[in-house]
Amino acid sequence: MASLIIDVFLLVLLVLIAVMVVRTCKLYAVIVMSGAYSLTSAAIFVNLDAVDVAFTEAAVGAGISTILFLAVMAYVPADEKPGLTRNFLAGFICIGAGALLLLAVTDLPSFGDPMSQVHQHVAPRYLTESGSALHIPNVVTTVLASYRGFD
């Protein structure tokens, strides 16, 4: 029951931060809230027992990205104001892309299906070859340090 309360609280907090990011016009506030969004995502990953993913999200999403955004802010003119124009072509393209994504989701395998293609190809390869190919005994460390390093 406590885990459910924590999950609901973190998801509500994540949605609130996302709404605040969209509604805020101040660039500095958006950067700070983006860092808060990443930290909240990291907390959700910790609650899901994915501590390695949480650590990566906290380090990259809240740490390095926030520092880089703040560094870029030094090059953004303070007096520049965005125009209030609406681009209907961009809106139609976004709606079309969203419709195509929804169509593609219907073709995905069922959630948790052990016979889906991803479980037949990649996971067995990681489990059998990670120790001998990279000489790291822990499979999770191998995937994070070697294979995910390309991301």
Regions found by a protein language model. Give the residues of each.
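Alpha-helical transmembrane segments of multi-pass membrane proteins predominantly involved
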Residues: M1-F150
